[in-house]
C-alpha cells in the first residue's frame, strides 16, 4: 500500500525506487558538465544513462488546459483544514510564482520538483468546477519513462487516465485508468490488478476521496510484482519509450452539494490542485549510450536535468542512437541487450570505396552474417564487398585484392566471344572459371575466340552462336574433319551426290545414304515405269496406271497383267452357218484343255467369222488357232482372211500392207492342238476387224489324197499373240535391251501364250512378262470380277482369273459351267437332272429345266403330275372326295376339306362330329356346345352322339359345366352366355374350397369364404392379428410382448397387431425383437412400459456403451462408479476428471457408507450432522455419538432465530440496493419535492414584476426548503449510524448464515438422495413390477414343470417332433438325386436349343425368294433382298439372271393356282387347330394353377410342422439357459421346474404319434405327383425338339409358298413380277421375325423350366409349348407335302418330255442320267419318310399330352381329398401351436422377471 507524503514526513523512509532515482539524478547532474569516457559496461553489452526527473529543466514544455487566474484573480475555497478561520482565497496566475512578489500564482510550472525550503507554498491549480483538464509534457527527444508520482493539494481526481505518445503527439496510447467507479467512468476497461505487464486496466485505490490533501497517485510502467520474460524485447522498449506524456483529469470529487446548489460559490471549492509532479525516466538510447548531452535547443546547464541527446557508443549515431554510423552498416541496427552490445560493424570493401549501405535481403541470404553493400566501387571493381572485377575485366591472381591494379582488361575477340568480349573475372575450379579466360561462342574456338569450329563457317559478331553450321548432308559428304569450306560453306560431295549441301542425288539415282557413292540407281522397270527417273527420297519410279512398287514391277490389287494370249475369241461366240456347239463337262480335279464352254464342230467348206473389236497397241500380231482333232493323225488346211473396215492410211503403222497380206494360209499337222499361221497380221487400236476362218479340207491320215469321211474339226478359240521382240525393251540396242532379249529367247518365255493351261512362269521370265504386258496395255487391266459370280473383287495378278463361286466359269466368273444354271449372287446351281426322268445331265442355263422323258414332270424331271403319287410308278390319290392331291411320296392327302382330317380325310376334326367316309348323310357337323367351333361361345373340347338317345354329348372344358357347357363350374366366374364371355378361375390365392359353389362370387370372381385366417377380395392378406404369406396358407397369430409393444396396437391383452408380412410387432421406443421382448443395444428398463431408456454410459469411463438390461448399471472401468460410470467409484467422491477422494465418514453417524459423490458430505442418520457425520445435529444435544433431542422449547427459539435470519436477509438486500443507487437513492422522493420548490423559487425570482405576496411566498418557500434540507441532513446522519449498525449485524448474520448454509447443503444432499431413490422407484414401477414378478414367478414355476414333463416323458412331444423331422429329412435326401438328374437333363436340352438358334440364318430364305443370299449390300447385289429398294424407293427383289421365285415363273403357273386354294384350306384348318391349342393352353394353365395351389398348401403344412418344432426347441433352450444362469438360486430353479412340469400338451402321445404318421402318409402321396410330373420332363424336351423341326419345315414351306405366289403373278403380267416377289419377301421377313420371337419364347420357357424344377405346377405349363409344337408341325407338314407333290407333278411332266427326247441323239447318255435321277429320288424319298415320321411323332405326342392331362385331373381329385385331410390335421396343429406359444410366452416372461429380481 502506497504511503502518503504526510506519512513519510512522520519518519517513514522513502521507497527504494525514489531513493535510487534521486541518487541517479544527483549523479547525472554532477557528471553532465564534462564528457565521460566510455563506460566499461558498454563494451560488454547494453548501457543506460542515469534516471532522473524529466520535468527538471523542461518547465516550459509542461502545459495544462486549465489554470486558475490566468486572465485575472479568481476566488476559490478549501474544504480541508477546517480548523483555520479563512477558507476562501484568490488565485492570480498572470505572473509566475514568487514567494515574495506573487505567492498566489498557481501555474503548471509550480509542480516541477524543487528543493526550496517551503516547497508546499507553490502548486498548480485548475479553474473552479471544470472536470475535464489535461496536463501534457512535450519532450524534445525519445526518453525512457519509468514511473509517475503526483501529489495533490485537494482531493485526488475521481477519474483520470495517463497517456503516452512515442511519435511526438501524432498517436496516443493509454497507460492506465484511475477511477473511483471504473464501471461508470470507463465501461469495458478491465479492472486492476493487471495480469500481464502490458495490460491496460482501471485502478481504484488512488481515486478515493480521502485524504483530502497531499494524496498521491503513483504509476509504474513495469509493475515489479509481474515477472518480465525478456526486459530487452521490442515490446518492453516500446512500452517505456515516450516523446509526450499526457494526464487527463476527467471527474472531480464532490460532496454532492453542487447537485443541489448551482451557485458559483458552491463550485469554488471543487477544482484540481497539484503540489508536485514527478516524471521519472532517462535518456532513451536503445542501450548504446551511458550518458546524454543537451539536445539542440535545450538548456545546457540546467541543474539536475535529464538531457535528451545520447552520446552514442557501439558505432551508432543519431539523437537516440537509432542509426549505425556511416561505413558501419554491415549488420542491421539493433538495440543493445544485456551481455550483447549489438554494435554496428564496419563494411568490408577492400579499400576500393568508403561508402556502404545495409541491405536486409543480402543479410538474410548470407544466413544473418553480413548485410553491408559497398557503394561506388573504384579501380574497376564491383560486388557487395568490391571483391569482384567489373565486366570486361578480370582479377590478376598475382596481385592482392586490395591492390588498385588488381583488375585487368580482357583480351577477347568480340566477334567470337560471348557478351562482346567478356572473360572470366576470377578463378573458380568448382565452376570451371579461369581468370582472364575468354568464353567463346558455341561454334567458336581459339584462345581469343578468333576462329570457327570444324563443321562451321562464317565468323560474325551478329551471330549469337558465332559461326553457322555447315549445311552438309552427312550421307552425301566425303568423310573427313572439315565437311565444308570455313569461309564460303561449300560442302565436299560424294561421286553420285550434288548440291551445295551435298543433299541431292544425281539424276537417275536415289536414296542418299552413307554408302561410298552416296546414292543408288533408280532401276525402274522398263515396262511398268513411264521413264527411268525416280523420287530422290523414296526411289519411287513413275508408274504406269495401276502399277505399284518402288520399281513399278507389281500390279495394284484389283488389277492384273494380261497373259500373252489375253486377246482370245471363243469359237462358240462366232458367226456363221448353224453352229454345231459341243459343250464339255469339266471333270472335278482336272484342268481343262480348252477355254469357254466347249468347241464348235467345223466341217470342210464351213467358215467361222470372228469379230475383233479392238486391240491394245498398233503392231503385228501372230494368229494362234486352238483346236482338237477328232481322229488320230488328223490334219487340216485352213485359210484366214482379214476383213478391214476400209483402206489402210499410208501414214499409219500398218500403211505398208498390201491386200494379199490379209489372206493367210495355214496347215495343221497331225497330233497338233494349235496352229500358228505363218504370217502375222498388222492391227491398230480403235478399229473393228472381221476374221474369217475357213476349213479348206481335212483328213485322217498322212496321205492327203486319201478321201476323208470322218467328223469335222473341233475349233476352240482364236488368239492374237503380239510380236513382242519388236518392242523397244528388246530392240533398244543398249546392253540392257540385248540382255533382256537373250533371256526371253533362252528361257522361251513366249510359250506362255500357246496353251490354255497355265503354269507359274520361271523367275527369269516373270519380270519380263510383266514388263511386256504393261508396255502393250499401258499398265495393268482391271479385274472386273462379276460380283455375283466371284468370291472376291480381286483376281490373280497374273492373267486376271477371278476366284469363282461353285459352278461358275470365265475369267470374270460371269458364266455358268456346263451342268449348272441360274447365274446369280450365289453362283450357279447344279442341274441335278433325274437320271430316271431326264434325257441329259445338262439343263437350260437360265431356268435349270432339264429335258424330261415322257411321263416325267418337274424342273428336274423327278416327280409325278398333280393328283398322283409314287414316282416313278405314279398312282391316283385316295382322299374320300375331300382333297384333290396328296403327298407325292406317301400318298397322304393334302388340304382335307369339309372339316375332315386324317391321312385319307377319313375322320372329323375336333369340334365336329359325323362320318366323312359315307358318300352322303353323315358328313362332319359342328358340336353345339352351346355354339359351334369358330364362334365365341364354344366351350367343349369335343362331342359325340349317344348311340341310344341320339343326343349330342358335349365334353366341356375345365371351368364349364351344363349340358351344353353353358355355365361356369364351382370355383370359376364369368358370363359365358354373352358373346365373348368366358369362365375364369377365381383368384383366391388357394385359400378357398374349390368345390364350394359359394366360395367366390360367380359373376365378379370376388372371394367370399376365405380360409386359413385370410381376408380380402382375393384372400391375399392375413387377418389383423395374424402374419405370414397368405398365398402359401401360412398366416400365424402375432406374438407380442406386452411390456415392449405399443399398447395402441393391442385391442386386447391376448391379441396385438403386427406387420402382416414379417410378423414384426409395433415396438415402443428403443425396443427391438420380432416380439418387442428386448431393449435395443445400449438401452435398458423394458419393464417401465414406456419403452427403454438410454444407458448413457460415460464414453471413456465405462468399458462400453452397454448396460444391464434391468438395472441400467454400466460396466465401469477401475476408479469410476455410479450408474453411468460418470462419478467416482463406490465409497469415493469428487470430480473423476480431476481427482477422487475416499469418503471420510464417521461410521458411527452415517446412514449409508456412500458419501455425496460431488461434495463428499456424508449421509448422516437422524440427529447427526457435520460433513463427516461426527457431531450432533441442530436440535440435538449430548456428546457424539450419543445425541439426544433437545427440549421441546427448542422449537420455539429456533423459529425466532429463523425469523431473525429472514430479517437479516431483507436488510442485506436493502444494503445491496443502497450500494447500487447510492445514498441519494433513499431520498429520491424528497429531492424531487425540493426540486419542485426550487423551481417555484426560480420562477418568482426570475419574474420582472414581483409583488409583496410573491415575495412573501418566496420567503416561505425558502424557509420550507431550508427546513426540509435540515431534516434531510438529520435523516442522512441517522441513516449513516443505522448503516453502521446494520453492517455489524450483517457480519454477525453472515456468520450465522454460514452455519445455515452448511445445514442447507446437508439437507439438499439428503433431498437429492431421496429424489434419486424416488426416481428409481418411479422408473421401476415398483408396485406393478412387484405384482408382475410375483405373478411371473408362479407362472415360471408352472412352465418349468410342464416343460420338464414334455421333455422328459417317453415318448414326449419333443421326441415325436424330432422323429418327424428326421423322417422329413430322409424323404428330402431320397428325392435329391432325382431332382439333380432332372436339373442336368434340362440343362443339356437348353444347351442344344441354344446351339440350334445360332445356326439359324435368313440367308437361305432370301436366296430362295430373291435369288441372292442377302448378305451383300443392296447396292452391289443385282437381285436385291430383304429391305432393299430401287432408285424410286420401291422394294427390289429378283431380276434377270436371278435364281429366285421370279426366274421360275414359266414353270409353276398351275402349281401356284392350286397352292393358293390349298393354302386357304390350310389356313382354315390352322384356325381350328389354333382354337383347340388355345383351349388346351387354358386348360393347362388352370391345371398348373391347381397344382401350384396344392403344392403351396403342402409346403405350408410342412412349414407349420417345422415351425412348431423350432419353437419347441427354442422353448427348451430358453429353460436350459435360465437354469444355467449364475444368478439363478436353487429356489428359483425349483419354482421354474415346477411350473414347466405343470404344463400339459392338449394331446396324448399316442394322438401326436398317429397325427405325425398321417401327415407323413399324405406327404408320400404328394410325392407321387412330383414323380408323375417329373416323368413328363422327357416329353417336354421331346416336344421342344419337335417344335424346332416343325419350325424348320414351316420355314421351308413358307419359302415355297412365296415362290409359288410370285410365279403366278409373273406369268399373268411381267410388269408385276417384281412387286409380287417383294410382297413375298415381306411375308418371309414377317415369318422370320415370328420364328425368332418363337425361339426367344422357347428360350425363356426353358429358363423358366430350369428355375421351377422343384414345382410340379411349372412342369404343367410346358404342355402349352407341346401343343404349340403340334400346331406348327401340322402346318409345316401340310405345306411341305404340298410342295413335294408339286415337285413330283413337275417332274412327271418333264419326264414325258424327256422320254420324247430320249429317242433322239441322247440315247447313249440315258443310263448315266437314269443313275443320277435314282440318286435324286432317294433323297426325295428320304425327305418324305422324314415328314411322315414327324407327323407320327406329333400325333403320338398329342395323345400322350391328352393322357397326361387326364391323369392330372385324376390326381387333382386325389389331391383335394388329401388337402381336406391336411386341413383337419393343420387345425389340430394350430391348436398345439397356440398352446406352445402361450407356454413360451409365459416362460419368457418368468425369465425376464427373475432376471429383474436378480
Curated annotation (Swiss-Prot):
Segments for region (Domain I): 1443-1798
Location in the cell: Secreted, Extracellular space, Extracellular matrix, Basement membrane
CDD domains: cc_LAMB2_C, EGF_Lam
Spans annotated as Domain alpha: 1410-1442
Pfam families: EGF_laminin (PF00053), EGF_LMN_ATRN (PF24973), LAMB1 (PF23219), LAMININ_IV_B (PF21199), Laminin_N (PF00055)
SMART domains, A to Z: EGF (SM00181), EGF_Lam (SM00180), LamNT (SM00136)
Keyword Glycoprotein: yes
Glycosylation sites: 248, 368, 1085, 1249, 1308, 1348, 1499
Biological processes per GO annotation: astrocyte development; axon extension involved in regeneration; axon guidance; cell adhesion; metanephric glomerular basement membrane development; metanephric podocyte development; neuromuscular junction development; positive regulation of cell adhesion
Coiled-coil residue windows: 1253-1319, 1472-1526, 1577-1790
Compositional bias annotation for Low complexity: 1350-1363
UniProt xrefs under Gene3D superfamilies: Galactose-binding domain-like, Laminin, Tie2 ligand-binding domain superfamily
GO terms, molecular function: extracellular matrix structural constituent; integrin binding; structural constituent of synapse-associated extracellular matrix; structural molecule activity
Chain segments carrying region Disordered: 1338-1364
Domain comment in the entry: The alpha-helical domains I and II are thought to interact with other laminin chains to form a coiled coil structure.
Function: Binding to cells via a high affinity receptor, laminin is thought to mediate the attachment, migration and organization of cells into tissues during embryonic development by interacting with other extracellular matrix components.
Protein name as annotated: Laminin subunit beta-2
Lineage, top ranks: Eukaryota, Metazoa, Chordata, Craniata, Vertebrata
Protein's gene: LAMB2
